[in-house]
């Protein structure tokens, strides 16, 4: 069996060296964000409680 590095991609597909992140996106042209997203563990106590209450309320309505 051939090694995966020795195989060429099917015709019409670019080689791995030629592929960028995504077509039309450049690292220099990214728009700045107006807000910072929080990491999963950075949510506050009140936000967690409200989320739990909403989930309980939705479960009560569905079941």
UniProtKB/Swiss-Prot annotation:
Record carries keyword Hydrolase: no
GO terms, molecular function: identical protein binding; protein homodimerization activity
Annotated segments matching region Disordered: 1-34
One GO cellular component, as annotated: plasma membrane
Main location: membrane
Tissue expression notes: Mostly expressed in roots, flowers and siliques and, to a lower extent, in stems and leaves.
Annotated family: Belongs to the CYSTM1 family.
Protein name: Protein CYSTEINE-RICH TRANSMEMBRANE MODULE 12
Organism: Arabidopsis thaliana (Mouse-ear cress)
Gene expressing this chain: CYSTM12
């Amino acid at each position: 069996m051939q090694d995966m590095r020795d195989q060429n991609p099917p015709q019409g597909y670019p080689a791995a060296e030629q592929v960028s992140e995504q077509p039309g996106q450049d690292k220099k042209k990214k728009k700045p964000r107006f807000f910072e997203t929080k990491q999963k563990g950075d949510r506050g106590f009140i936000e967690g409680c409200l989320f739990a209450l909403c989930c309980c309320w939705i479960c009560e309505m569905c079941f």
